[in-house]
Regions:
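Conserved nucleotide-sugar donor-binding
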Residues: 3-16
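Short, well-ordered alpha-helical scaffold segment located
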Residues: 12-13, 45, 95
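Catalytic donor/gating beta->alpha subdomain of glycosyltransferases that bind UDP-sugars
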Residues: 19-90, 161-165
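Alpha-helical transmembrane segments of multipass membrane proteins
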Residues: 106-113, 133-136, 163
Length: 183
């Protein structure tokens, strides 16, 4: 689906959307279900204010992931009717993002198991502790690469928690735009 900042569509194609779901996602993908095209225009830009607070950004990503996954479940019967190319685009864009936390946890677990099997439990534990220490020191001394890695990890974690909330039956109906430094 299109981003909520800016998209346009024919009024006749605009669907009825439940209040707790992502209207921009449903509205912008619905034309495909009725055989219409969705196009992107490269010379149109939209700007949104971004938050400068990591905690606000974490909550925002978590809320959006919960609503997006609930929206996916709402759209599932129609998604199955899409052609293979559109279904591939949808799955490769959405599923990988939603389940990145699970993939990351599995990667960490299997990496730890591999190190245990190759070098022993002590080496695996030392490697894990060294990784944690590197992250802590990088954040403490404000190393840009470490900060970027932590932000990526937090984004993946927020998305994973949002999906878990959706699977547990949680929904969000209202939201407050994040405050930015410009407010």
């Amino acid at each position: 689906g299109a981003g909520g900042a800016l998209f346009a569509m024919r009024r006749s194609l605009y669907p009825t959307i439940p209040i707790d779901l992502l209207d921009d996602m449903i509205a912008s993908i619905s034309p495909i279900f009725s055989g219409h095209r969705v196009v992107s225009v490269p010379d149109v830009y939209a700007f949104e204010r971004a938050t400068s607070d990591s905690a606000d950004e974490f909550r925002r990503k978590r809320r959006i992931a919960c609503r997006a996954f609930n929206t996916h479940r709402f759209l599932a019967p129609q998604l199955r009717t899409m052609g293979l190319l559109n279904r591939f685009k949808y799955v490769s864009h959405k599923y990988i993002r939603w389940f990145s936390a699970a993939f990351l946890l599995l990667w960490l677990l299997f990496t730890f198991i591999a190190i245990v099997s190759l070098a022993g439990i002590v080496a695996a534990t030392v490697t894990a502790l060294a990784g944690v220490l590197l992250l802590v020191l990088g954040l403490r001394f404000n190393l840009p690469l470490i900060g970027t890695l932590v932000e990526i990890f937090m984004s993946i974690l927020a998305t994973g928690l949002g999906v878990l909330e959706a699977l547990a039956g949680r929904s969000y109906q209202t939201w407050t735009p994040a405050k930015s430094r410009r407010d």
